[in-house]
Amino acid sequence: MQTNRIEQLSVPANTVLHGDCISIMRSLPANSIDFILTDPPYLVRYQDREGRSIQNDSNTDWLIPAFTGAYRVLKQDHFMISFYGWTQIDKFIHSWRSAGFRIVGHLVFRKQYASKSRFLRYQHEQAYLLA
């Protein structure tokens, strides 16, 4: 596997890192990551038909530490795409901006299925392009 040597740490090239993002990013050197794609908990207290839920989907404590860590490890003039929960967009935007990110684009993806809601059928996912 090809690696890039940065500040005595080795960052694997073309690698997906899976785990607790705050812990993983603490171990990475600043300005070492080319691109971040994140689909974090949406803060909507999601529960599926079988009653399963998503960890930290009602807890906002991780927002600012996670996005501050992402900003620290992302190389200057590179991008992060972050999905978000539209009902909590104010919290996501505040966290992104507090970390130092600029919003430079908005992406909308059509889904093949509809999410349950009270008034509308949600058939799309959204993400922001951040720099």
Where are these regions (language model features)?
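Core catalytic lobe of class I
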Residues: 2-131
